[in-house]
Amino acid sequence: ALGYEAHARGSVRDIIARHAAANGVPFKLADAVVRIESRYNPRVSNGGALGLMQIKPATARGVGFAGSASALYNAETNVTFGMRYLAQAYRMSGGDVCGTVMRYQSGHYANHMNAANRAYCSKARAIMASN
């Protein structure tokens, strides 16, 4: 089982790397977001957020997605649109890690860190430092 998990994580990280580069997001930041959101499991769903990057269908539609919600369980599709949203948050935050994850988690127009955002930022920084 461990071998499969490592293989799945490796192929997911290849997808993350490709889309992070295409969207101008540092790989370590993109990888940390996926790890926090789904632990690399493309089948995760929580509160209407789906897949690897836990993106809601309405949010995905806002960055060009036109498929059915279930299509967001596909790793490639999910990361395509999740990374577009993350890249916008990254640009709006001037590349600041905490600002990026705050906007990714709470919406692009969030401008005050809440406790959940602070915890997310701490996790992201720890993951980025260990990668």
Locate each region found by the language model.
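Short glycine-biased active-site loop of nucleotidyltransferases that positions the nucleotide triphosphate
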Residues: R43-S45, M113
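Non-catalytic cell-wall polysaccharide-engagement segments
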Residues: A1-I15, A21, G62, A66-Y73, ...
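Substrate-binding/active-site groove segments that recognize
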Residues: G48-A66, G82
